[in-house]
Amino acid sequence: DVSRIVRSYPGVSFSPIGYRNDLIVRGGSPSENRFYMDGIEIPNINHFATQGASGGPVSIVNADLIREITFYTGAFPANRSGALSSVLDFQLKDGNPDKQAFKATIGASEVSLSGAGHLGQRTTYLFSARQSYLQLLFKALGLPFLPNFIDGQFKTKTRFNEHSELTLLGLAGIDKMKLNTDEKGEDAEYLLSYLPTIHQETFTLGASYRHYNGRHVQSLILSHNYLNNRNLKYRNNDDSSEDNLTLRLRSTEQKTTLRFENQTRLGAWTLKEGAELNNSIYTNHSRQRPVSYTHLR
């Protein structure tokens, strides 16, 4: 998990909640960090993330696909706008131009499949997909909540000639948490009394066109991010009737970005200039009913 690794750097502290990997840089908020992958902004890199924060228990990004990471805690590059605490910049590997290679892995909590290769002479690809079986482990351990996640990512790079290339990139994560109402006992019943069911989806799709012209490098980047978060809670966890509904939350965040960058090398100096357009849409629908309890003596 990359987020847990960079927590050992100076000025970086960790969340007091042990299972989360929030980055708290120089006293800033976890929501003040920015993440980029091959120049494309990624709003969320963790499963079961909390809106308004950047952390979660499990990373969406497959570390096997990462070639290089640059972590900024200050002096942010001009083309990495909007960050107040830190910037975590991922560079993914390219696909294999010579052969097709695939890898299957069975881990302690998930199974995964990844691959790298080429599509013709000009295009390479890289992909990864994971499916967890945490819900089976949690049920076997007798826990009252059953989390599950799926994620996937891909990258293709097409080299038109020695001066221009096009990169397509995608990242997706789906999180679900159900309740194990079969569990009995005081602790389990207490957790089941307030924990909601969770369904969360996050998607990022982007394209980056890059042109090399001597000392100049021009980039045109188009990306779209989407986050959907739904929580439901029923009285006594009985979803047979809408009358039992005590909490319904649906929140979505969407952001479309178009960015142009020009980079010029002037001896030991690098000059960067560009422009960026953003279109953001936020919606929130919530419904909550008060729940009354009667204590009998």
Feature roles, as predicted:
Residues 1, 20, 56, 66, ...:
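Transmembrane beta-barrel architecture of outer-membrane proteins
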Residues 1-76, 87-93:
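Periplasmic N-terminal accessory/gating domains of Gram-negative outer-membrane beta-barrel systems
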Residues 16-17, 63, 80, 105-107, ...:
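Short sequence motifs at beta-strands and strand-loop junctions characteristic
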Residues 32, 64, 97-99, 110, ...:
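Strand-connecting loop/turn motifs
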Residues 34, 68-79, 85-93, 100-144, ...:
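Predominantly transmembrane beta-strands of Gram-negative outer membrane beta-barrel pores used
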Residues 46-50, 136-141, 180-182, 232-234, ...:
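Short acidic, glycine/proline-rich loop/turn micro-motifs
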Residues 50-55, 71-72, 96-98, 136-140, ...:
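Extracytoplasmic loops and strand-loop junctions of Gram-negative outer membrane beta-barrel proteins
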Residues 157-175, 196-297:
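Face-selective signature of the C-terminal outer-membrane beta-barrel domain
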